[in-house]
Amino acid sequence: MKSSVLVIDDNDIDQYLIKRQLTESGFTKQVFNSANGEEAIVFLSDYDNNKAEYKNEFPPGLILLDINMPLMDGFEFLKVFKKLRQERDYCATPVVVFLTSSNNQADVDKAMDFDFVKGYLHKPLDIDQLKKIVSN
């Protein structure tokens, strides 16, 4: 079981379904949601408040990331998150897995260029596939 998961997806229904699947399967108890990459960066950057509120659940151990979102898409998030990982030790922990409806091979290749991206899954979420990726 992962300590916590951050789901970055602009679709409220997808967020709800992913959260439900993660918690009901016993994968995690705590799921954080962000509607886009910008919102997620703000959340991840606020260490003091989040650590005080969520204790051992912050920072999340896993980030599930969509590609197509407003304000800051998944690839823009990765660029900013890469810098955040270098600046803040606690951000070096989370594993990123893309969870998207995109079947574009160029997107897969682009995502896997980041060393902290460990997988690329297609919606809907397959918990067994996610467990395989996270366990490696």
Task: For each feature predicted by the language model, list its residue ranges.
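Short alpha-helical interaction/output segments
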Residues: 18, 40, 74-80
